[in-house]
Design a protein with these regions (language model features):
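Cysteine-rich micro-motifs
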Residues: 23-33
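Intrinsically disordered, low-complexity linker/tail regions enriched in polar/charged residues
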Residues: 1-12
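Exposed aromatic-hydrophobic patches
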Residues: 63-64, 99-106
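Short amphipathic, basic-aromatic surface patches that mediate peripheral association
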Residues: 64-72
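Short cysteine-rich clusters marking metal-coordination/redox-active sites
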Residues: 10-13, 29, 117
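Short Cys/His-rich "knuckle" micro-motifs
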Residues: 19-23, 37-40, 125-126
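Residues immediately within or flanking Cys/His clusters that coordinate Zn2+
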Residues: 7, 16, 26, 114
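Short acidic/polar inter-strand loop motif in beta-rich domains
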Residues: 118-125
């Protein structure tokens, strides 16, 4: 059973979807069940992947990793997403951009911060 805000990936074509209406027993793409992505918080390479929140209560910046993540065609951060009490905000990134996002929200409303690396998958910080 899918749940709200879960991510799934197609192993055939690479499509990634986020559940906005929960309840489907499974998600299918390219004729095969999609794989649920589990967000990592620690692992080899965490210094380049775990989102870091910086800033005050009236706005903040999310940087990817304590060491800046590469942003090249074959290895980059695809998006940074924050889950707040009543909404979700996402910044999509491209190779060559700085792996960070600025948000004008209250830091105290953050439930979770996530990012997706094109090579190493989904990472989070609470």
């Amino acid at each position: 059973m899918t749940k709200l805000r879960e991510f799934y990936r197609c192993e055939t074509c690479g499509n990634i979807v986020e559940v906005v209406h929960e309840g489907a027993p499974s998600l299918v793409c390219c004729g095969k069940p999609m794989i649920k992505l589990e967000a990592k918080t620690e692992d080899q390479g965490q210094e380049k992947h775990v989102p870091v929140i910086e800033g005050a209560d009236n706005g903040f910046t999310v940087k990817v990793g304590s060491i800046e993540h590469p942003m090249v065609d074959e290895h980059y951060i695809e998006f940074i997403e924050i889950l707040l009490k009543d909404k979700v905000l996402r910044k999509e990134l491209r190779p060559g951009q700085v792996p960070e996002a600025k948000f004008c929200e209250s830091k105290s409303d953050i439930i979770e911060v996530r990012e997706h690396c094109s090579v190493h998958g989904l990472w989070k910080n609470k």
